[in-house]
Amino acid sequence: MAEPVIMAFVCYQUGYGAADLAGTSRMQYPASVRAIRVPCTGKFDITYALRAFQKGADAVFVAGUKPNECAFETGNFKAEERVKFGKQILDELGIGGERLEMFFMSGADAGKFTEAVKEMTDRVKKLGPNPIKA
């Protein structure tokens, strides 16, 4: 299997900071992750994940602020609920809900970001490629 393609929707306040710090600190993680910055994970919509799977992503994760640390107060909790709902949709579509995950981190959690990428990469390697990948 080729290296899995992982899409990460990252909060501008926290997830993006963690991803940026991981890069500037030269931390090692699979290069197959593609990070898309969103103003807040509360802006994340399940259609973003569905489109990513349609375009060939093997997994998608959302990296938001830690609980009670969201700059927009409840954005991370809204994203968490959408991810839970998205998992159900992915199971019903036969793609698999385990291909979608939510992680909470601060902007200083570079290690948490790299762990999330590694966890999702390992998960996809066990599951195999996206079943709807063209």
UniProtKB/Swiss-Prot annotation:
In Swiss-Prot or TrEMBL terms, this protein is called: F420-non-reducing hydrogenase vhu iron-sulfur subunit D
Which Pfam families does the entry mention?
A: FlpD
- Superkingdom classification of source: Archaea
Q: From the Swiss-Prot or TrEMBL record, what is one GO molecular function term?
A: metal ion binding
Q: Which UniProt keywords apply?
A: 2Fe-2S, Electron transport, Iron, Iron-sulfur, Metal-binding, Oxidoreductase, Selenocysteine, Transport
Keyword Metal-binding present in the record's keywords: the answer is yes
EC number(s) stated in the UniProt entry for this protein: 1.12.99.-
According to its UniProt record, which cofactors does this protein need? [2Fe-2S] cluster
Q: How does it assemble?
A: The F420-non-reducing hydrogenase vhu is composed of four subunits; VhuA, VhuD, VhuG and VhuU.
| NCBIfam families assigned | F420_non_VhuD (NF045873)
Q: How is the cofactor bound?
A: Binds 1 [2Fe-2S] cluster.
Q: Which InterPro entries match?
A: MvhD/FlpD (IPR003813)
The family line of this record is: Belongs to the MvhD/VhuD family.
Q: What EC class does the entry list?
A: oxidoreductase
Q: Which gene encodes it?
A: vhuD
